[in-house]
């Protein structure tokens, strides 16, 4: 199914699966060199795709250029896989008009969206505002007609994966700033080697705790995160060392509490909201945000609303 259709059909219970796909999406494509950007800018959207997107029967995904930085080695495989799945679905549904061209076009939209995500992440790290004109000039030249859908998808993925929101501050000139979602002041970019914002994972964990009822067993946290292919003992291309991030960094930053379950033998541990999280945001904000960008997989839709409404009344 094409990327746009996937988003349109996303249900609340598919939230973490959607995040998992997004995590694979935003880590597999190296940023283009100046020469590549110039060549891309002088071509139309479909023309760019014809030389870049593999055929439906291609045995392997495209590879990133050698020497790609760790900042952007996460995007090609998922795009290739989604394109391949789209081709398979088309075959099952029967012949359609120009299926190869349609697949290439959808892949081109996805590829441009990914380029824009990387561009906006660089702007966020530099703490610089960005205009629509700058996005068109730097990333989407000759793609003006497709700007609304590409920009919308890029904004959605920034929220979904990184917890970064694109906010329009001057509508007349289409000037935007990039800020962390929900008023959280942590993004995990304190060290020189920290290249990916970590706010998205923090929001996911806070949501899991809120849904579980003020505290969540450690195994429940890792069970949910495994749906994003984020595992306790495995280094992650976006979140680096997830175990250290949750059990040390976010605890030290007072966003999470990690404690032994009282009376447990053998010892079991659980996560709670830390004091900094309680000051900067709230259960209702986190739960509404979770519903807005895709929902939660295992807890049914109504209870999520009920909990948010209860807190709103309190």
Swiss-Prot record:
Residue spans of biased composition, Basic and acidic residues class: 1-20
Domain spans labelled MAGE: 109-308
Tissue: Expressed in many tumors of several types, such as melanoma, head and neck squamous cell carcinoma, lung carcinoma and breast carcinoma, but not in normal tissues except for testes.
Organism for this UniProt entry: Homo sapiens
Compositional bias (Low complexity): 21-44
Protein name: Melanoma-associated antigen 2
InterPro entries in alphabetical order: MAGE, MAGE_N, MAGE_WH1, MAGE_WH2, MHD_dom
Gene designation per UniProt: MAGEA2
Domain of life: Eukaryota
Locations listed in the record: Nucleus; Nucleus, PML body
Function in brief: Reduces p53/TP53 transactivation function through recruitment of HDAC3 to p53/TP53 transcription sites. Also represses p73/TP73 activity. Proposed to enhance ubiquitin ligase activity of RING-type zinc finger-containing E3 ubiquitin-protein ligases. In vitro enhances ubiquitin ligase activity of TRIM28 and stimulates p53/TP53 ubiquitination by TRIM28 potentially in presence of Ubl-conjugating enzyme UBE2H. Proposed to act through recruitment and/or stabilization of the Ubl-conjugating enzyme (E2) at the E3:substrate complex.
Any one GO biological process: negative regulation of transcription by RNA polymerase II
Region described as Disordered: spans on this chain: 1-69
Disulfide bonds: none
Chain positions found as Phosphoserine: 64
